[in-house]
Amino acid sequence: MPQYRSRTSTAGRNMAGARALWRATGMKDGDFEKPIIAIANSFTQFVPGHVHLKDLGQLVAREIEAAGGVAKEFNTIAVDDGIAMGHGGMLYSLPSRDLIADSVEYMVNAHTADALVCISNCDKITPGMLMAALRLNIPTIFVSGGPMEAGKVKWEAKIIPLDLVDAMVKAADKNCSDEEVDAIERSACPTCGSCSGMFTANSMNCLTEALGLSLPGNGTTLATHADREKLFREAGRRIVDLAKRYYEKDDATVLPRAIASFAAFENAISLDVAMGGSTNTVLHLLAAAKEAGVDFTMKDIDRISRHVPCLCKVAPAVPDVHIEDVHRAGGIMSILGELDRAGLLNRDVPTVHSKTLGEALGRWDIMQAHDKAVFDFFLAAPGGVPTQVAFSQNRRWNELDMDRAKGVIRNKANAFSQDGGLAVLYGNIAEKGCIVKTAGVDESIWQFTGKARVYESQEDAVEGILGEQVQAGDVVVIRYEGPKGGPGMQEMLYPTSYLKSRGLGKECALLTDGRFSGGTSGLSIGHASPEAAMGGAIALVEDGDTIEIDIPNRRIALAVSDEELARRRAAMEAKGAAAWKPANRERVVSAALQAYAALTTSADTGAVRDITQVQR
């Protein structure tokens, strides 16, 4: 029987000093025998997805204490990728994932907490906490802040749904008036919550449902809706039960590594492919699998992406469907239900809320559920009132979207495409693979051949696109923006947004060893591995080279001979210390980012640390 970890600092005469300090935090005599539950909150006033979380940790804490536990809350950092986008701030986004993972580990282990509630929401916070949970392997449950309501703007007598990406695209469109841009800016992000499309934050929160580490509805229940409060309260009660099952009944099935098994990771990427999730999820799932000790690789993602269909298209893949619409169609449990009926799901994996995922689907998938409370739960609608207050409205749709032929969620027979929403491409320019979000690519350009227009940084690429250097038929190549080369693997949302604003969204491709925002659509291929700074062939591309992209056959190729590539590689190596570095790029890289670059690995392994460099 495992002993409560907290007994290390709460039991025995020699711990009188530690108990004195615990008492100073408010603990009393009867508390020292209870499980100590850490609450990792990520409240910050910098990020709309986190601005409403300030009091929610204590909401969870009260439920923990009512259920017989002791709750101790702490905070970790959160970076807003949208605000950090397009300038040096984006260098810090991906590295913050590792800092978040470390900070949670530090706090939980330093204070010997028994279990963990992760209150996350946005792009790097959920992945960072997920990595920490799998590293710590103590009972853990995730509850996110929830998605933002979609924006709506009235323009020329039309009500137009929109989101953050629309603001970026329209701002760079010379045909849009200042008045229209201002109206969109003021309407694009109306409430607290993670941005309203199937961007990285919402994708990751949905994937925690598939991994079995969060409650049904975690990924899709709006931040503003009263129903989300139920998830926070249930998480507080549930974590005490999980802790007691492990420490008092020796039930190891409640541990994160038992739940997030290889089969669960297969379910997560199947969901990702089916819902056309952000390409960043690939990076984060690979990193999480590494922490879990699960041998889940790009080859597994490639394998799954070839036979799982695209069952759901959400902004940015389509302009008028947002996460609130997915919720109305039954949320993530209903997408998983369709995968299950297609024979594409591992049903027998445990979750934090049910004995098996299959059992959970029987209750929560609206196509097979019988509980009126479940139907009512998925009728939760946007309130339509700008606010930064959580749980501030209780509006309901009149009816659910249960149309699996033409609705937001489709069944396999009526899939948007039998090819999934994500694909891994391989070739001489990306020998270890690269990722494209096919759900956001018009099928007319799934096969594309163009001339390379090469840039050594995102900033130069933006200047080239807005300066009209890039023309229809070009393949924009942005290199030395990988985890090591950036450093920090910047997102390329501005380049793709500016291509759209120039009307080139279906006329050009973009290839990078950096990554893309979940808000990106178009023929945008990222995570090219190995990256340029680690000797990848993307560093050898020259202006005017022909690049061939073939999504159906999962192929990408630089149309030069092996001999020519070898010649270019030899010429690069001959540069000595200047080899595999960007030419004429001026960029201030802080000591913190240099330390990150020294240990990070390429995108095909999740950009995790190479700890062999520090192990003795």
Swiss-Prot record:
Free-text remark on how the cofactor is bound: Binds 1 [2Fe-2S] cluster per subunit. This cluster acts as a Lewis acid cofactor.
Pathway connected to this protein: Amino-acid biosynthesis; L-isoleucine biosynthesis; L-isoleucine from 2-oxobutanoate: step 3/4; Amino-acid biosynthesis; L-valine biosynthesis; L-valine from pyruvate: step 3/4
First-tier enzyme category under EC: lyase
EC nos: 4.2.1.9
Active-site positions on this chain: S517 (proton acceptor)
InterPro entries recorded: Dihydro-acid_dehy_C, DihydroxyA_deHydtase, DiOHA_6PGluconate_deHydtase_CS, ILV_EDD_C, ILV_EDD_N, IlvD/EDD_N
N6-carboxylysine: residues carrying this PTM: K124
Cofactors (names): [2Fe-2S] cluster; Mg(2+)
Annotated positions binding [2Fe-2S] cluster: C122, C195
MF GO annotations: 2 iron, 2 sulfur cluster binding; dihydroxy-acid dehydratase activity; magnesium ion binding
Pfam family, one: ILV_EDD_C
Binding, Mg(2+): D81, D123, K124, E491
Record GO biological process: isoleucine biosynthetic process; L-valine biosynthetic process
Keyword Lyase carried by entry: yes
Reaction catalyzed: (2R)-2,3-dihydroxy-3-methylbutanoate = 3-methyl-2-oxobutanoate + H2O; (2R,3R)-2,3-dihydroxy-3-methylpentanoate = (S)-3-methyl-2-oxopentanoate + H2O
Keywords, in A-Z order: 2Fe-2S, Amino-acid biosynthesis, Branched-chain amino acid biosynthesis, Iron, Iron-sulfur, Lyase, Magnesium, Metal-binding
One Gene Ontology cellular component: cytosol
Highest taxon of source: Bacteria
Record family assignment: Belongs to the IlvD/Edd family.
Subunit and interaction comment: Homodimer.
Function description: Functions in the biosynthesis of branched-chain amino acids. Catalyzes the dehydration of (2R,3R)-2,3-dihydroxy-3-methylpentanoate (2,3-dihydroxy-3-methylvalerate) into 2-oxo-3-methylpentanoate (2-oxo-3-methylvalerate) and of (2R)-2,3-dihydroxy-3-methylbutanoate (2,3-dihydroxyisovalerate) into 2-oxo-3-methylbutanoate (2-oxoisovalerate), the penultimate precursor to L-isoleucine and L-valine, respectively.
Protein name: Dihydroxy-acid dehydratase
Organism of this sequence: Azoarcus sp. (strain BH72)
Species lineage: Bacteria, Pseudomonadati, Pseudomonadota, Betaproteobacteria, Rhodocyclales
Gene: ilvD
